Regions:
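Conserved P-loop NTPase/AAA+ ATPase motor core
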Residues: 230-282
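Conserved AAA+ ATPase "SRH/arginine-finger" region at the nucleotide-binding site
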Residues: 71-74, 149-162
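C-terminal helical "lid" of AAA+/P-loop NTPase domains
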Residues: 186-191, 197-211, 221-227, 245-249, ...
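Pre-Walker A (pre-P-loop) alpha-helix and adjacent loop at the N terminus of AAA/AAA+ ATPase modules
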Residues: 2-47, 86-89, 259-263
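Helix-loop-helix "sensor" segment of P-loop NTPases
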Residues: 165-185
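Short glycine-rich substrate-engagement loop in P-loop NTPases that contacts/grips substrate
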Residues: 23-28, 67-100, 111
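Walker A/P-loop
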Residues: 2-3, 32-71, 85-88, 118-123
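Conserved catalytic/switch belt of AAA+ P-loop NTPases
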Residues: 31-34, 103, 107-146
Length: 282
């Protein structure tokens, strides 16, 4: 099918939003803002596939605000200014329902691009939602960061992933027509790495590769179809230092299992072996 499974079953309301209960559950910080209809500018910080874009879309829908979306990968200052001008002409301007501008991968914006947002946020022409996989303290300019609340989105838990699998099989227009049985889930859950999008991509790949209306999913089947899990590891970002720190702490704490795990993460992610060796002798 042309539309990916993750898009077909994207949640449309907070009631259907499976994860991030610390933010959107009862007494959650974002849920409280939504209930009071006083949404502030926000930065959603978390790994891929944790629902950052979906959350932004749901908040716009449930607060009944105009919603504009830009990707920092292919948008420049001209695109930002165009959206701001549209927002300024909105009927909801200067109300509690001013337009929302969502910028995906906001960490990719240069300083000048981020600067172009400041006046619009300051004047209340827009409420800014930004999504990033990088630490906003390093990637978002201080003037913009001070005008936004930063919320950390966590990787999906095992329980959330299992619920997502069941929802996809039961609710998706295509999968629900097949008899999909989850006999074993360990492999598909492990390969997803807490990434909801990746989980759904694997599920769809496995089901579509079977030319049958009845599909029984096993660990062996998943591993045969996927073959290799690409480890999430950034050799130049904050994760680079977090993982080497965890590795060294595991050694100092005499925890061989943890030390081997962190070492394997670095090697699988393509870390420079000389870097690891240098840290070992410090």
């Amino acid at each position: 099918m042309s539309i990916p499974l993750a898009e077909r079953i994207r949640p449309k309301s907070l009631n259907d939003y499976l994860s991030q209960k610390h933010l959107v559950g009862e007494n959650g910080a974002i849920k409280s803002q939504l209930d009071s209809q006083m949404l502030s500018s926000m930065i959603f910080w978390g790994p891929p596939g944790t629902g950052k874009t979906t959350l932004a879309m749901i908040l716009a829908e449930e607060s009944e605000r105009p919603f504009y979306m830009l990707s920092a990968i292919d948008s420049g200052v001209a695109a930002i200014r165009e959206v701001i001008e549209k927002a300024k002409k909105s009927d909801t301007l200067f109300s509690t329902k001013n337009p929302i501008l969502f910028i995906d991968e906001i960490h990719r914006f240069s300083k000048s691009q981020q600067d172009s947002l400041l006046k619009a946020v300051e004047k209340g022409w827009i409420t800014l939602f930004g999504a990033t996989t990088e630490n906003p303290s390093f990637e978002v300019i201080p003037a913009l960061l001070s005008r936004c609340q930063v919320y950390v989105l966590e990787s999906f838990s095992r329980t959330d992933l299992e619920a997502l699998l069941k929802r996809a099989i039961d609710k998706d227009e295509y999968l629900s027509k097949k008899k999909v049985i989850l006999k074993e889930t360990e492999a598909i859950l492990r390969l997803s790495g807490g990434d909801a999008r990746k989980l759904l991509n694997i599920l769809e790949l496995v089901v579509l590769s079977e030319n049958s209306d009845a599909v029984t999913i096993t660990n062996k089947m998943v591993l045969q179809k996927v073959q290799k899990n690409t480890v999430l590891y950034d050799k130049t970002g904050e994760q680079h230092y977090d993982i080497i720190s965890a590795f060294i702490k595991s050694i100092r704490g005499s925890d061989p299992n943890a030390a081997v795990y962190w070492l394997a993460r670095m090697i699988e992610g393509g870390e420079d072996l000389k870097f690891i060796a240098r840290r070992l002798v410090i």
